[in-house]
Curated annotation (Swiss-Prot):
The keyword S-adenosyl-L-methionine applies. It is an enzyme of class 2 (transferase). Its EC number is 2.1.1.107. S-adenosyl-L-homocysteine binds at P12, G87, G88, D89, T117, A118, M168, A197, A225. CDD domains: SUMT. It comes from Pseudomonas aeruginosa (strain ATCC 15692 / DSM 22644 / CIP 104116 / JCM 14847 / LMG 12228 / 1C / PRS 101 / PAO1). Pathway: Cofactor biosynthesis; adenosylcobalamin biosynthesis; precorrin-2 from uroporphyrinogen III: step 1/1; Porphyrin-containing compound metabolism; siroheme biosynthesis; precorrin-2 from uroporphyrinogen III: step 1/1. GO terms for molecular function: uroporphyrin-III C-methyltransferase activity. Pfam families: TP_methylase (PF00590). The lineage of its organism: Bacteria, Pseudomonadati, Pseudomonadota, Gammaproteobacteria, Pseudomonadales. This is Uroporphyrinogen-III C-methyltransferase. It catalyses: uroporphyrinogen III + 2 S-adenosyl-L-methionine = precorrin-2 + 2 S-adenosyl-L-homocysteine + H(+).
Amino acid sequence: MSGKVWLVGAGPGDPELLTLKAVRALQDADVVMVDDLVNPSILEHCPSARLVRVGKRGGCRSTPQDFIQRLMLRHARQGRSVVRLKGGDPCIFGRAGEEAEWLARHGIDSEIVNGITAGLAGATACGIPLTYRGISRGVTLVTAHTQDDSPLAWEALARSGTTLVVYMGVARLAEIQAGLLAGGMAEDTPLAMIENATLGNQRECRSNLGELLRDAGRFALKSPAILVIGEVTRDIVSQPISLSA
């Protein structure tokens, strides 16, 4: 009898933001396949599982996606409960949809367990509400990294009127800035750069679109980091919003 694959979001980093369903999946797992951006302390929930490191991070040597999928398939066909543990939410730039579809084509049952995405949790940890009545009525989540390195429609995003949350953008700051300015976004549009969201070494830098490159250089911004762009970053909230229950 085949096992099952759980595509689990580990959240942004803070282990207290892990969902109860994710904890149960980890506790019941025979095999846990762990991404690079998962906080190691989260693995305390699966002390008896076999751990397999399948790191994927931009700019670094990564485990091939085909290898990851075939490894999930092999363990599931051997009747094991497999957790594919991903940072953030598996459905936000985490390829969960692709993996679930691939597993289904090969006759393997899977289930997605959502996690809190870094764009939301990082903004909240810095006192930034992504929507705010009268200021921002929508949010656009976008990755600056594409499979074929094709440019994004930054000009259209500049005209969306929503808060922009940019993932995987550290290496493309010049492209982001130029595209948004070309789309008519004002140079004084405020933004926040948030590195290592919700972790003990989280760092934050407030800037604006016109000074993005200068301030990112002075700040020595490094991955993993997100950009939050829009009026909601203008210190609406005077202190970080509590992430605890």
